[in-house]
């Protein structure tokens, strides 16, 4: 049985939630392998809108096992609230349908405070974080002072972990002008939340390996996008974890040989939230039109997204670093009505043509896009479910994208509704 990794191939917000939900019917297990609740998924199922941040997209599908892997950083208080919200919408969530890796790091209140304090004081070069503590939690994980889910089960261990973390954080807070952390209040909060988290705790690595040996199909769900990867993204304007497909293995505790297909999710244009380079960004009427038609506001923050033309040069990079086998092209319908469309095929850097975005931030800032123009289409593609439903110029656009990124289109999405999807290649096909 094939196991599939789904990754965002741009700067996030590509429509992964819909595609993961669409694929989840073919999967037995849906496992999230990185990120925190700073990334949001919006699912529309039978007219019901579900907004997920920490929970895997598979929770809204009955009879599936959803997993939060060790590569995720988890805010336990947020998770409890999100579970309650989704339950109120009629979704059953139990330890039989949701498992959390015992070695998953926890985001604590002081992580968010530190995140916001740094961002507020860094007036010269803001990163554009959501202020939810994701980065500081990952720092603690690497610094070997993070509190993990399993630590909630033993009072003595929990106290030791808290004391170790506070030695570091109180010194750091002093330099930022923040009050020391109230140790006793923190311990009380953790002891109160523990009974609501521990029933979901499990040795996820063991469960997933057993599922794989039993021939179950596993869908690995990433958050954000490959251009926000801590190593291969537009550093330092990136997230604090690896986002590329290779993280799926380490983020849940399964070998890389378990990955059979990597599906990259790609908008038919480009968007970005927050700071950082964006070569094809549009500050004109076309950019406004893309944002309005595409409803480009963040699920988590409500922040307006920056919009621009499709960047094939960047997509070639992410296809390489994630080993993408095929892409799901989303929001094709947003391009309806444009007389002319542009695709970035490379960059001009001080008179030299490049077919990739350089690593150095100063060079990224000096890159100007080299465009190829294509005719648009006046017909509507919204709701199309087969190639026959698409205008000729829309098909030409999709085919040109394939040629430029050297990767086939496996799926095309033409509306937020899950059924409005053109399937070219089933990623789960054996």
UniProtKB/Swiss-Prot annotation:
Organism for this UniProt entry: Ruegeria pomeroyi (strain ATCC 700808 / DSM 15171 / DSS-3) (Silicibacter pomeroyi)
What pathway or pathways are given for this protein in its record?
A: Purine metabolism; AMP biosynthesis via de novo pathway; AMP from IMP: step 1/2
Cell location: Cytoplasm
- What EC number(s) is this enzyme filed under? 6.3.4.4
Catalysed transformations (reactions): IMP + L-aspartate + GTP = N(6)-(1,2-dicarboxyethyl)-AMP + GDP + phosphate + 2 H(+)
Q: List the cofactors.
A: Mg(2+)
**Name under which the protein is recorded:** Adenylosuccinate synthetase
Instruction: Look up the record and give one Gene Ontology term from the biological process aspect.
Output: 'de novo' AMP biosynthetic process
State which gene encodes it: purA
What the protein does comes down to: Plays an important role in the de novo pathway of purine nucleotide biosynthesis. Catalyzes the first committed step in the biosynthesis of AMP from IMP.
Q: Which Gene3D superfamilies match?
A: Adenylosuccinate Synthetase, subunit A, domain 1, Adenylosuccinate Synthetase, subunit A, domain 2, Adenylosuccinate Synthetase, subunit A, domain 3
A GO cellular component entry from the record: cytoplasm
> Mind listing the UniProt keywords for this protein, alphabetically?
Cytoplasm, GTP-binding, Ligase, Magnesium, Metal-binding, Nucleotide-binding, Purine biosynthesis
Residue positions annotated to bind substrate are: 299-305
| NCBIfam families referenced in this protein's UniProt entry, alphabetically | PRK01117.1, purA
